[in-house]
């Protein structure tokens, strides 16, 4: 067996309670579509179609299961009592916003699940995983424990993988996972890389902060993860996100920048000090080839970048060169579409652009890149994880049938109070864990 390294996309399967409750402050699309009806079945099938599209391009593709929602255990911890049906009824009557938070399917956005460092970058030669604590938004803070269980179930081999507990919850160590992290290398995933951690604020002050929306990632969280993952300080860069970008709706840096191998595609407003950031990246690359592709405000206004999710596409390496997998909204935005045409016309490392329909996710503020967690693994490490999570033709067909069997095609936030929805979800997840060979990972299955 060769020990080449590959970047694998672990996509979150959209959960049965996918809805538009407008929970995410700072996420413009989430607020815009609040209280509209959603289509969980369509959302899950769109996500599955994206996975299959990437797999057909030759990209290695795997899945992460949804989380159990509504989170009745969380409602119990918050003072609601009785059986599941009674708890849902009381929560719907007394605090429907809290019920919506406990019913969110936001774990579908796997880019926020964790930060992952490949073995090539870690001093101990293992791949490291830290599940994100996501404390800024209550509905997302509920995900960390189950995310940890899922990652430990998939990457169970202790020789190859090291798992760290989520950072302490609170304002100092706010961690939003890989949505604020990218890794560059000099042309091959298996080479030593430069890990770029982008943060929105220093929890101890001293730097300008956004005025309108919260900065979700702290410098302290990023520094802690770099230490936990045994990274060489010479191969780590901490970069502050431009507060203006956050206030414009770029609540994660992957809304305004995306990197892959030796390419960084970024908006001119992405970083607080772009010249210094690029200088440090170029210094790390030295004589090795590096492509920085800046998109100016004149080419694509920041408001268009945020609404089109141009930068929230997936930048992937195919046999024919690098491809950008962008949402349909980027094609439909005149400035973004014009830029992409010009990008392809002038040549360069990005050889093709493909547009994908993930509109149900986009309406909640999650583009193609939000739906996946990038994990770089060697062939040896790939052989050490559960093979049942990789997207094969059989799994693709099986998941499609599973979605059509268990998911509703119309859901309002108020429907989260329906005890039948809870039972439908548990039945679906129980079947899914058997399909994926993950064992008991949910509270209703006895996991703790």
Describe the residue ranges of each PLM region:
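The feature marks the mature, well-folded catalytic cores of soluble enzymes
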Residues: 1-448
